[in-house]
Design a protein with these regions (language model features):
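Perimembrane helix-loop-helix junctions
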Residues: 183-209
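Transmembrane helix irregularities
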Residues: 24, 80, 127, 142, ...
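Membrane-interface alpha helices of multi-pass inner-membrane proteins
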Residues: 152, 164-190
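Transmembrane alpha-helices and membrane-interface helical segments
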Residues: 153-157, 184-192, 282-287, 337-353
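Aromatic-anchored segments of alpha-helical transmembrane domains
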Residues: 123-130, 175-176, 209-219, 310-321, ...
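Membrane-interface micro-motifs in multi-pass membrane enzymes
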Residues: 96, 103-107, 115-158, 176-177, ...
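Acidic, Mg2+-coordinating catalytic modules of nucleic-acid enzymes
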Residues: 291-325
Length: 421
């Protein structure tokens, strides 16, 4: 009883600390609000101009998928006054992040059970370099955090006949908020085959329905030439170089540290690519050797291990062929980086080899430290986090109230505006 009270108190303190870190990164956004790009110019503008039904079922065919949470955020924000609308949208974007921390800390999971690793995973999600300013507190990129949340949901320990309706709602919203979560469908399928609980069955059915719906939207957008022409392209060597830098390198070293190493050692792209490939092959070979030697460890954990590998490679393939142009950094690199970091954490948990455990903990702490350094003021894109000569929202609303044809200035400024007439 006393142990349980102490354990709960630790979780409450950690949750509060995470909230403080979130507020530290962007106090201006959380106190004043801001619309980021299409969050305002498309999704909120739809709700403002066309009402509930149009906004709820709106599909941006140029992107090729339904983004339900962005639609819902625009609708709810429109219920409030125009001065409060961006603030409401920002707090709605915070919802999946808080749910992620709640599930990590308070839910029984096959993925992580000990408090110290729950703490480490929370810090990795919040502070590591993949949590770039581009995806911070805006509804259009909440799909990334809903995918992470869905991945946590699938590894919940479920009773045979109990149903958690919150989990079903999360899967439904996540599945209709972009295509990332739909990629996890095979994991939901094999989780059901493995445990055969009622919860896993309904999770699978809901995500299957979402995946089919999103697939139909993608096919329709592509066949009718509504899909942005830069999407669904072939993979070339320059894209691979870009991917290697933005995912495995930056996930652990961050932008500043990786560029410091490359520039000071005068390493060219081709040589860096060669070194990373060799290092990856050595790590893979060692893991194969280790698991063959410790078959019982692999057998106990192969479902989670294979799920992490599948998620990493499938999401990586998706961003490589579905990203815009020859760039897979920023928001595109977030999920592959998350799965790679989580794989490293999971291996650190299950291995009994001291040298491997030390190495994995070291690269995870480097990821946290490099991400913490870039978390706010040392970030190249800090204008996405803090107000630096940003438009005053109250003044923008007053200008719009005087002239309904005025284009309201939103973030990223000064190039983005929002039309509400």
């Amino acid at each position: 009883m006393i142990y349980q009270i102490i354990n709960n108190r630790k979780k409450e303190i950690l949750f509060f600390v995470l909230l403080l870190i979130i507020f530290y990164r962007s106090p201006y956004i959380l106190l004043h609000g801001r619309f980021m790009a299409e969050e305002g110019s498309r999704y909120f503008a739809n709700a403002y101009k066309y009402g509930f039904y149009y906004s709820f079922f709106f599909v941006d065919f140029s992107s090729g998928y339904l983004n339900l949470w962005a639609n819902i955020s625009g609708i709810i924000a429109n219920i409030f006054t125009l001065k409060l609308a961006p603030l409401i949208s920002n707090y709605l974007a915070l919802v999946p992040k808080l749910l992620i921390f709640y599930f990590i800390l308070y839910k029984d999971s096959y993925l992580i059970d000990k408090f110290q690793y729950k703490l480490l995973l929370c810090l990795l999600i919040l502070l590591s370099p993949f949590n770039v300013p581009e995806i911070w507190l805006n509804s259009i990129n909440s799909q990334i955090f809903f995918c992470i949340l869905s991945f946590l949901v699938v590894f919940n320990k479920n009773e045979k006949k109990d149903i958690n309706y919150l989990n079903l709602l999360i899967i439904l919203i996540a599945g209709f908020t972009g295509v990332y979560t739909c990629i996890l469908l095979p994991i939901f399928f094999f989780k059901y085959l493995k445990f055969k609980t009622l919860q896993d069955k309904y999770n699978l059915i809901i995500l299957l329905f979402c995946a089919i719906s999103q697939f139909i939207i993608i096919v329709f957008a592509k066949t009718t030439n509504l899909l942005y022409e830069g999407k669904l392209h072939i993979i070339d060597i320059n894209l691979i170089y870009n991917y290697i830098y933005n995912v495995p390198v930056k996930a652990f070293l961050g932008r500043n540290l990786s560029q410091f190493i490359f520039y000071n050692l005068n390493i060219n792209v081709q040589f860096a690519f060669f070194l990373i490939c060799i290092l990856s092959l050595l790590i893979a070979a060692y893991l194969i050797y280790y698991f063959k030697k410790n078959q019982n460890i692999f057998d106990r954990n192969k479902f989670i291990f294979n799920s992490l590998l599948y998620s990493f490679f499938s999401i990586s393939l998706l961003i490589l062929i579905g990203g815009v142009g020859d760039y897979v950094g920023g928001r595109y690199a977030a999920l592959p980086s998350f799965y790679l970091i989580t794989l490293a954490l999971f291996l650190a948990i299950i291995t009994n080899n001291l040298n491997l455990k030390i190495f994995l903990h070291l690269i995870l702490f480097i990821s946290i430290l490099s991400g913490a350094y870039e978390f706010k003021n040392n970030n190249k894109y800090k204008k996405y986090l803090i107000c630096i000569d940003c438009p005053n929202w109250s003044s923008e609303v007053e200008k719009f109230n005087k002239n309904s044809h005025y284009n309201i200035k939103i973030w990223p400024y000064p190039k983005k505006t929002m039309k509400l007439n």
